[in-house]
UniProtKB/Swiss-Prot annotation:
HAMAP family: MenD. InterPro entries: DHS-like_NAD/FAD-binding_dom, MenaQ_synth_MenD, MenD_middle, THDP-binding, Thiamin_PyroP_enz_TPP-bd_dom, TPP_enzyme_TPP-bd. Catalyzes the thiamine diphosphate-dependent decarboxylation of 2-oxoglutarate and the subsequent addition of the resulting succinic semialdehyde-thiamine pyrophosphate anion to isochorismate to yield 2-succinyl-5-enolpyruvyl-6-hydroxy-3-cyclohexene-1-carboxylate (SEPHCHC). GO terms for biological process: menaquinone biosynthetic process. Its cofactor is Mg(2+); Mn(2+); thiamine diphosphate. One of its GO terms (molecular function) is thiamine pyrophosphate binding. It holds the Pfam family TPP_enzyme_C. Keywords: Magnesium, Manganese, Menaquinone biosynthesis, Metal-binding, Thiamine pyrophosphate, Transferase. Its EC number is 2.2.1.9. It comes from Shewanella sp. (strain MR-7). This is 2-succinyl-5-enolpyruvyl-6-hydroxy-3-cyclohexene-1-carboxylate synthase. Homodimer. Coiled coil: none annotated.
Length: 573
């Protein structure tokens, strides 16, 4: 084949891939510059059905795609060139696999004759993500390979996708056509003649039925299950699962609803949100130990005390509801797992428990803790928990909340306030890394342009400074709240043998501030050390059409000392 025909066919395959992905539900494509992925890049540049996002750092790009997929509930495509560009996606792919977020990696690659021979920027890319992505290896574009094969390969890999797929795309040079004029997928092209019908409509070439394997108990099984003292636990749930239905379910059965930070229900007034603290409250814990059946929605619980409670209790019946088959119980309890959407399961024909309202006293204990937190956190010294509670109480219906790992998400889980409504809440708690948090929040903010707040620690932000580049491109409010306690102060809560080891090998104090970083990326910046200034800056930032930074300066020991003091009060209640 002449070289010009090679470039044209490369581009045509790229266009077929991007068009079919758009028909399969992809709305966003995240792209990093590179030469070997040129057929995909040029095709994406002409694809009007996809919103394009560009970033030079593939690690941040992968996490941005993760955020876009979380917020949209749809697969997101990622285009990279060959070599370590692909490897830099690994952390985001791991997180997406563990949390069932659909990402589609389209990696440009060298042809077979340039692999394993010292050719430039060539590594073994197939299976680079090991067990964390479904692998599809495309051959180099060839006129002897029917275009239908390409489409059916994509359809089989992507339809009903709930986890990452890696599609490795080999291209021979030349990669750049001599001109870019007209439509790439020209219906007059002899190569595309078998796709005339496909070109005339907007449906995928192969249309798969939904592969949902929903399961539900019989009425008799439900009646037996609710006959006793039980609890309902809301773990990690997405907004699409409509977790609000669990409130009505708990009220109908007459069992308490215990809520995790990631349930979308942590602040609901009808839920027992302070469960982490109640499990060290002597009277509350004694009451909870009377339960002999449990209904868990989702998994990946944050509270170690709640995880231990599930592990130590002698359950007569343990039901868990998950949207797809998974193993999300580190205590390995004997249980019945039902595959269903949380809202669907909550709307089954449930009966009133024979022990309805058995744990009503928990409401009193929960309210006592709420009053304690108002007195000792909201009205106490300035600190991280105070800031997090202030954020959670501000315009919850108007914004989205992304909570960073390490100390921020734990403070929210322990001390979030009760409120009439809760912001849609996101986390990265699959692998629970501190990398890519800003990039993920940028993706969440970029999908619909809804005001978004990111609560992030100083080390997490240092880990993802490059993603300020993504943040500055946003045209909707993204408030980046950096809790700067000068190091990894979650280690203050852990039993490191002595303070010298803690300081030298765990906390890693750095003495850095973020004002110059914000200035480098031309982002509005404020540094605060009291609640009044924070609230003033925060309200202003929520109205700013773009990203802005608020750095909260706190001492290394403020949060850990406050946690210890509150724990002592709760244990003595």
């Amino acid at each position: 084949m002449r070289t010009e025909n090679t470039a044209t066919l490369n581009l045509m395959w790229g266009a077929l891939i991007l068009e079919e992905l758009a028909r399969l539900g992809v709305q966003h494509v995240c792209m990093a510059p590179g030469s070997r992925s040129t057929p995909l890049t040029l095709a994406a540049a002409q694809q009007t059905k996809l919103k394009r996002h560009l970033h030079f750092d593939e690690r941040g790009l992968g996490f941005m795609a993760l955020g876009l997929a979380k917020a949209s509930g749809a697969p997101v495509a990622i285009i990279t060139t060959s070599g370590t560009a692909v490897a830099n996606l690994y952390p985001a792919i791991v997180e997406a696999w563990l949390t069932h977020v659909p990402l589609i990696v389209l990696s440009g690659d060298r042809p077979p004759e340039l692999l394993g021979c010292g050719a430039n920027q060539a590594i073994v890319q197939p299976a680079i993500f090991a067990n964390y992505a479904q692998q599809v290896n495309l051959p180099t574009p060839d006129a002897h390979i029917a275009p239908q094969m390409l489409l059916t390969t994509l359809d089989e890999a992507v339809a009903n996708q709930t986890r990452p797929v890696h599609i490795n795309c080999m291209y021979r040079e030349p990669l750049y056509p001599s001109e870019m004029s007209g439509t790439i997928l020209d219906s007059e092209s002899p190569y595309l003649r078998p796709l005339q019908t496909w070109l005339q409509h907007a449906r995928p070439y192969t249309q798969y039925g939904k592969s949902e394997q929903l399961s539900s108990p019989s009425d008799d099984a439900i009646m037996r299950f609710v006959h006793g003292k039980g609890v309902i636990i809301a773990g990690t749930l997405t907004p699409e699962q409509d977790p609000q239905q669990l409130i009505a379910l708990a009220q109908k059965i007459g069992w308490p609803l215990l809520t995790d930070a990631q349930s979308q229900l942590r602040q609901h007034p009808a839920a027992i949100g302070n469960i982490d603290q109640l499990l060290q409250h002597p009277k509350a814990r004694n009451l909870l130990q009377e339960a002999d059946r449990v209904l868990v929605f989702g998994g990946r619980l944050l509270s170690k005390r709640l995880i231990a409670y599930l592990a130590e209790q002698n359950w007569h019946s343990y039901w868990q509801v998950l949207p797809q088959q998974d193993r999300l119980d580190p205590s390995h309890n004997a249980k019945h797992i039902w595959h269903a959407n949380a809202a669907q399961f909550a709307q089954l024909n449930w009966y009133r428990s024979s022990s309805a309202n058995w744990a009503n006293t928990l409401v009193t204990y929960n309210d006592e803790l709420h009053s304690l937190f108002v007195r000792n956190i909201d009205q106490g010294e300035f600190g991280e928990a105070q800031v997090i509670r202030a954020i959670a109480n501000t315009r919850p219906l108007e914004q989205q909340l992304f909570i960073g790992n390490s100390l921020p998400v734990r403070l929210y889980d322990m001390y979030a306030p009760v409120s009439c409504c809760t912001a849609t809440t996101y986390t990265n708690r699959g692998a629970s890394g501190i990398d890519g948090l800003l990039a993920t929040a940028c993706g969440i903010a970029a999908h619909q342009g809804k005001p978004t707040s990111l609560i992030i620690g100083d080390l997490s932000q240092l880990h993802d400074l490059n993603s300020f580049t993504i943040a500055r491109s946003l045209t909707s409010p993204l408030v980046i709240i950096i809790l700067n306690n000068d190091g990894g102060n979650i280690f203050n809560l852990l039993p490191v043998p002595n303070e010298e080891l803690r300081s030298d090998y765990y906390r890693l104090s750095h003495g850095l501030e973020f004002g110059y970083a914000a200035a480098m990326f031309n982002l509005p910046y404020n540094q605060v050390d009291n609640l009044a200034d924070f609230q003033s800056c925060y309200h202003e930032a929520l109205d700013y059409q773009g990203a802005s930074v608020i750095e909260v300066s706190v001492s290394q020991h403020q949060a850990s000392e406050q946690i210890a003091a509150l724990n002592l009060w709760v244990k003595q209640s």
